[in-house]
Amino acid sequence: MINSSISSKLTFIIDYQPIVETLNIGVVGSCATLGCWQEPVAMQRVGIRRWRVDVDYGSLPDSFEFKFVVFDPSTSHINLWEDGDNRIFSKRSDEASGRYKAVFRGTLDWHGAGVAVPVFSLRRRNGWGVGEFTDLCLLADWCVATHQKIIQILPVNDTNISFDDTDSYPYRSVSIYALNPIYVNIDKIGEIKDTNLLREFEQERRRLDEQHRVQYSDVLRLKLSVLRQLYREQRADAALYDTLRRTLFSFEQRNGWLLPYAVFRCLADDFGTGNFYAWGDWASADETKIRRYATDNAEKVEFYYFVQYHLFKQFREAKSYLNAHSIYLKGDIPVGVGRLSVDVWQYPHLFNTDKQAGAPPDDFSDQGQNWGFPTYNWANMSKDAYSWWRQRFSFMQTLFDAIRIDHILGFFRIWEIPLTVSSGLLGYFSPALPLSVEEIRQYKLPVDEKYILRYSDGKELIVTDTDNVLFIEDPYKPAHYHPRIMARKTQAYKGLTSDEQEVFDRLYNDYFYRRHNEFWQQSALNKLPVILDDIDMLVCGEDLGMVPASVPDVMRQLNILSLEVLRMPKEMGTEFVVPDRVPYNSVVTTGTHDTSTLRMWWSEDRDRVRR
């Protein structure tokens, strides 16, 4: 993309893979300002993969050729010229905005080893029964000693809505911004002055630290109790509180999400439930009411500012430590948000709250998956150029160097299940091109009411309800139908004649594997380029499962790394991924958060692993 400007400078921005610290990205070209093809102009690193440089616009000729290069700044020796023809810039033909942004063409074959681990597993001696953000520094020391470059963690957002062990699921966030209090290091905040309470808290801390497994709800309960006491004591100290109050006010001013999150948390405390549908007049968020509540309940609201302030302070200090030791931190963006979340409460128009996301059946789950998240209303999101998503990624960029997009297939299409249904078997892809009655008849198949499942009556359905149906009516387009997933296993299919079965198989295969290729490709291209436009993180997509044929091309086009799991090869007829066959722009791993760990896998399947 070329943009120029009748301004004092022209800014070059290039995205490229990580490179070794001794090398630099530069721009070199046919004019003196760009080194006459000999002396590259050094660019400055502004992210894990983004580089930029400003050059004097007036010193550039009306037209010139150039390329981006990798070079050694100490000698100006060019190690790598980008592929393809020279880039051409013309002041006469190019639009004005002072910016030229592109992706480097070619590769230097940089590789980086790393480790994926949940933060809760990083337990240190004399801890609180769970890993904490500060423990990432200890892991970084180990990575340095073992020559690793990347630490990948599971999502660390606040997930606490029921305050029991179900809240430990890291992919159902209460807020896409707030961090989970379970990861705070209490010792870094201060010490309880009340000796009786201190003794009581210390006794419980030791008990939890001695447990072999994380006692999630007990640890969270203890930490929140200690945090409340610390806040009360610090608030009671006039001199200390004056500084604290100003610090928290500044933190709130820099984070627009914090006020509604804190009020949401307080209302959940007030009503004794995080189910905001049971909050009466508060069932829907209102900015004026939120601000009034915060004014009337300043101390309660400020407590949640206090918690989040220390969480972010500790997280950023840990990340700074990692980066200072040349370790990149990779985060994880879940495919959905919790149904009972601040985001759904504030922006219900962005979600289909009568639907839920999941995944179709596969070799690992014959019933499919139902994650329970509301699906996204992409039509409404597109009205402001996906600002909710753009803000989400921009915020993640302040925390991480690289990001994993969980279930990137959801940007192409999502497996959608009505709220009245529990099984993933009863879903359909959305968006989709459901079949009309005429199209089904063209296959010489009977359009019999007994073979059709309708959701329009709103009654709750169970798996056996679908055993005698071949089609599911589309909820958005009446009289249009999706073939029922895994239809060959139904009694309805077995009741067809052999000729009808053969015809249905053709319809089914065309529908799921060919019909939507271009449609889903365009669906993703409508969203992802806009959402990722200003992101300089290294982006990886979790492209596992029932993958549309268009996914790899879109990911290559957008420079998104694929995920290759050693024990889950994408190539048919192979038992394991062959590393030298995977694309360069990929992350190769021995497993995911849904599989056993490397050590467990080695122990549980020794004969297969040894092959």
Predicted regions and their residues:
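Short, conserved beta-strand segments within well-ordered enzyme catalytic domains
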Residues: 26, 67-69, 152
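Catalytic cores of glycan-processing enzymes that make or break glycosidic bonds
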Residues: 1-5, 55-56, 90-611
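Aromatic-rich carbohydrate-binding modules that target alpha-glucans
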Residues: 16-61, 71-94, 128
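Secondary-structure boundary/capping motif
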Residues: 7-9, 44, 323
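Short, loop-centered acidic/histidine patches that primarily coordinate divalent metals
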Residues: 69-71, 408
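A short, amphipathic beta-strand motif
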Residues: 10-15
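Exposed beta-strand face motif in extracellular beta-rich ectodomains
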Residues: 62-66
